[in-house]
Design a protein with these regions (language model features):
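N-terminal leader/targeting pre-sequences
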Residues: 2, 6-9, 15, 19-134
């Protein structure tokens, strides 16, 4: 009887480990670095949502409402035209579901950036490259 209990516990432990691993393997974190001496930095968390991707931004030092986007390119060479608009960062937080798969976004060639304000879109305050294979 004790042998069956130990076996059942071992099976449950393995299942819990597998479930935890698959959930975290689907989530991708992107480091957001300060730009133009803004002092703003944080993390973008990308999670698959079917053929779309949920993007959650957590930005420290952000003030007011700041437009954010996913652009083609890297932080060093952003295409000025946004590929996917994100909900503005308000009080350091933003959450958006974009119509792009995780596979597409993590194939390389995209970056997430934030602008100082709707009136000053040319000043980037944070940026993070979505690297291939993340």
């Amino acid at each position: 009887m004790f042998r069956n209990v130990r076996l059942a516990c071992a099976v449950l432990g393995v299942l819990a480990l597998l479930i935890g691993t698959s959930a975290s393997a689907q989530e991708t974190k992107v480091k957001l670095d300060a730009q133009n001496n803004s002092g703003e930095s944080g993390t973008a968390t990308l999670t698959p949502a079917g053929d779309s991707t949920n993007v959650v931004l957590d930005v420290k030092g952000a003030e007011g409402t700041q437009p954010t986007h996913i652009h083609k390119g890297t932080c060093a060479t952003l295409d000025p035209k946004p590929s996917f608009p994100l909900s503005p960062v308000v009080n350091g937080k933003s959450e958006t579901t974009v119509k792009a798969s995780m596979k597409d976004l993590t194939s390389g060639g995209y970056a997430i950036n934030g602008h100082k304000s709707a009136q000053d879109l040319k000043t980037y305050v944070f940026c993070g490259d979505i690297k291939a294979g993340m």
